[in-house]
Amino acid sequence: MRMLTRIALLLAAFTAAPLLAQTAPVPSTPVAPAPKEDLVPVAIDTSLGRIVIALDRGRAPITTANFLHYVDTHRYDGQNFYRAMHMTSAEGGGGLIQGGITTDVRKLYPPIAHEATSQTGIHNVAGAISMAAAGPGTARADFFILLSDMPGLDAGGPGGDANGFAAFGHVIEGMDVVKAIWNSPISATKGEDAMKGQMLDPVIKIIKAERVK
């Protein structure tokens, strides 16, 4: 729950910032696209369809290896997308969906080192996949996919903090499925504090996650 709250609070700070700060890009050195051999495609089959994500093991090797560990041992199979965060039009629109392992902590592996966006050059933009975390070195299995650019989730981003959230890949197929999950019914009462009104009801099942060619 701590990692959920941290994302919610950072997003609240980000969306409360002046519009100029929200839309201004985070200064960074341009990064060349990752070579094909550094990208690992993974399919996430859900009850609403398939999402295919290219994981960037060249620029985010630790985070990618961790995600693949869960994929290869089938620990995401049978789990859920459980959250859909919607930003208002005044906040720039868009949002994110979040999923992972929430029902069986025995399936969790140890937390991993944080790979900041300032280190990898992979930013929290529309279509990116990032790890949920309560702080550096706490990410385990939960992840989110963005439907809009959110520079406030980058390291040192506007309205965010110095660490941000580790982005490690991007959707290459199935953004329509991401949007369908995002548009699914939300409970008006489930969730605590800043998370209230963001919990999917019912949750969207992750049938399986696997590497694909």
Q: Model-derived features: where do they sit?
A:
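Cyclophilin-like peptidyl-prolyl cis-trans isomerases
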Residues: 21-213
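Long alpha-helical, hydrophobic tracts
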Residues: 3, 18-21
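Bacterial N-terminal signal peptides
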Residues: 8-18
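Bacterial N-terminal signal peptides that target proteins for export
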Residues: 1-9
